[in-house]
UniProtKB/Swiss-Prot annotation:
EC numbers on record: 2.4.2.7
Species of the source: Natranaerobius thermophilus (strain ATCC BAA-1301 / DSM 18059 / JW/NM-WN-LF)
Protein's UniProt name: Adenine phosphoribosyltransferase
GO cellular component: cytoplasm
Organism classification: Bacteria, Bacillati, Bacillota, Clostridia, Natranaerobiales
Domain of life: Bacteria
Role played: Catalyzes a salvage reaction resulting in the formation of AMP, that is energically less costly than de novo synthesis.
Keyword Glycosyltransferase among record annotations: yes
MF term (GO), any: adenine binding
Catalyzed reactions per annotation: AMP + diphosphate = 5-phospho-alpha-D-ribose 1-diphosphate + adenine
Cited NCBIfam families: apt (TIGR01090), PRK02304.1-3 (NF002634), PRK02304.1-5 (NF002636)
Cellular compartments annotated: Cytoplasm
């Protein structure tokens, strides 16, 4: 795989002072690298293919559908509160810079469906943990997480627990 780290742009003080934002758009614009990212994240779950891929708003919406297509799974968006039009299951969560609510349509995940949760970045683990809680509220089974990047110093893995986690690059 190409060295992903070389394609990530740091944006200091975004979205607020003191935060260094990891911009993945510089990696996504390279078609060869994008294909490698999708294949590498997908291949970790090929033996036990999930039924659904849940992509976390917003950059999980970029990776999630491509991984779903690669694995032959359905795609489900996990959106910020108030953005989905039908009845939802929801969970409050904290990030490195805010508190928010995440929602998934109640009919998006059926009982015992195997679910892979996808996002671009694992930081504090708050968003990932909230998404797993919603999947479990809907009686789905979380089979793991897939992230392009991890900010390991923020210890997000501790919040997620014992689920399998695939990360392509740690910072």
């Amino acid at each position: 795989m190409l060295k992903l780290r070389d394609y990530i742009r740091d944006i200091p003080d975004f979205p607020k002072k003191g935060v260094v934002f990891k911009d993945i758009t510089t990696a996504l614009k390279d078609p060869e690298l994008l294909a490698e990212i999708i294949i590498n994240l997908s291949s970790h779950y090929e033996k036990e293919v999930p039924d659904k891929i849940v992509g976390i708003e917003s950059r999980g919406f970029i990776l999630g559908p491509a991984i779903a297509k690669e694995l032959g799974a359905g795609f489900v968006p996990a959106r910020k509160g108030g953005k989905l039009p039908s009845k939802t299951a929801s969970q409050e969560y904290n990030t490195e810079y805010s508190t928010d609510v995440l929602e998934i349509h109640e009919d998006a995940i059926e009982k015992n469906e195997r679910v892979l949760i996808v996002d671009d970045l694992l930081a504090t683990g708050g968003t990932a943990q909230a998404t797993a809680k919603i999947v479990e509220q809907l009686e789905g089974q979380v089979v793991g997480f897939a992230f392009m990047l991890e900010l390991s110093f923020l210890k997000g893995r501790e919040k997620i627990g014992d689920y399998p986690i695939k990360v392509l690059e740690q910072f």
